[in-house]
Amino acid sequence: MGLTQLPEMLLAAANGRGVASVAVIERAGAEPHVYWVPASDSEPAFLAYSITKTFTAALILKLCEEGQLSLDYRLARWFPHITHADRISLRQLLNHTGGIPDYGGIRAYHEDLKSSPSIPWSFERFAAETFDKGLWFEPGQGWAYSNPGYMLLKRVAEEVTGVSYRALISERIARPLGLRRTFVAESIKDLAELAPGTSSALSPDGAPRDVRAHYHPGWVSHGVVASTASELVRLLDSLFGGELLSPHSLAQMTELVVLPTDPSEASLEQDASSRRGKPSYGLGLMGDPVSPWGLAVGHNGGGPCYSASAFHAFDLGSASVCAMGAIEEGFSAEDVVFDVLDHLAASGNSRAAQQGIATDGASPRS
């Protein structure tokens, strides 16, 4: 059992409910194997949601390498009015230890999303509902997942460069790595070429609505990347292959903070799987130093309609795996990724390589 199982695994996970894809780079520098369902002429694209945080972290680290920023810079340089901004570092924003509140549990956010999905909150509204009210804990004295923390990082990158976040991601990451279908979505029109799908989170009565026609990406406060599974595995493979950042920056990016064990203290975007040994977080990276596949890092993303998961397993031949779907219920991108990693571990990457499995550039036959 190895990569030959990918089509069957994806078909089972999607179960005819919508569009889904999976891509695998089985060893560092290899070409990706990619499959998608249902059959179509081109690989589908999706919103990657919080996988965007990995892009933001890489961008901030690149600006640090250029001398425009330092991870030790304090937030007070740009936002002096935020509580304890003089004690919150960019590093703490990146690893969610700065105490910046999130909006995931705020009723008004979900109510406004349902009633006005095409009119997102402004930066000022996100701020007013979260960090303008104070911090969740003293900087450096806890951990809590924070989308507004990454919204602040996005604004910092734009302030120091004078360039929009969309252009920065294109110029500093996507273009150098040849990611031609990866971009920051900023309008409803930007969703037109994505995989079709619906969401019940976009209407007051819970009726499913076409995400591409109604959902404004601005509801993701920190920005949201649209991409394909094959391009996201290329991102991870290139990132950890040293094509984007220096060894020093990568070491900082993968320095992990172990998450609180009490589920009431912290939560990730998807429930922790039993295959997680020690859930941790680096700089824009979810991670586990003692997973069944050794050190594994990456990120999950989820929101209306779309879900995504992409992880890199250093001790498994530096394999990278990404799954994405336009299926709101009953599909777990993370489970697909973990299943693929299990199969790679069981079959052995060296054996898979010797079998010479060819890259499938089209959707599997059904």
For the regions a protein language model found, what residue spans apply to each?
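Alpha-helical structural context
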Residues: 78, 97, 159-160, 176, ...
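Active-site-proximal loop and beta-strand segments within enzyme catalytic domains
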Residues: 16-21, 40-145, 163, 203-204
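Generic alpha-helical structural context detector
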Residues: 91-95, 128, 175, 234-237, ...
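Mobile, glycine-enriched helix-loop/loop "lid" segments at the mouths of ligand-binding/catalytic clefts
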Residues: 188-208
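Catalytic loop of the DD-peptidase/beta-lactamase superfamily, centered on the K-T-G motif
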Residues: 1-35, 43-47, 158-163, 167-170, ...
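Catalytic-site signature segments of enzymes, centered on catalytic residues
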Residues: 33-36, 42-45, 105-107, 113-191, ...
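Secretory-pathway/luminal and periplasmic proteins that interact with or process carbohydrate-rich
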Residues: 82-89, 99-106, 176-186, 258-265
